[in-house]
Swiss-Prot record:
This is Uncharacterized 19.2 kDa protein in cobO 3'region. GO terms for molecular function: guanosine-3',5'-bis(diphosphate) 3'-diphosphatase activity. Keywords: Cell membrane, Membrane. One of its GO terms (cellular component) is plasma membrane. It comes from the Bacteria. It comes from Sinorhizobium sp. It is found in: Cell membrane.
Amino acid sequence: MEAGVERKIMIDLENSALQFATRAHGEQKRKYDGRPYIVHPIAVAEIVRSVPHTPEMIAAALLHDTVEDTDATLLEIKEAFGPKVATLVAWLTDISTPFHGNRQVRKELDRQHLASAPAAAKTVKLADLIDNAIAIKAGDPNFWKVFGAEMKRLLEVLGDGDETLLAKARALAPE
């Protein structure tokens, strides 16, 4: 495929993912600063863009919270963006529900799920952790104690992700 055509396909995929995520998240706001929620997926995508990536990883970064936090489904994502993007989003979506138990139990289930994820999904998750860590540290120091401990445990299973992002995430995590 010609480089120009490939670039256009990549841009179309990213623009479509951004539009889908913006619609899906609608009026949602970030808990820690009240900004429109879409700023988080955009930040995650930009962090992923800073390291070796594929167009599907950027799309998944933009869509990573849609199944978890909106009415969007994996089937809709698969139909709109293809199986590669949908598979990445599936890996990035928490599998636990309140039915599974308290937060500690749920986060452990989600950690085990991510442990088996491909490197591309782990790279997007590292970007997600980095953006969330920065926001939570600044906006909710009390919750940072909980999130920071969870982040530290999660980093144990994300070693196959991008090494630059892994180092950044480790630097943000509590000692």
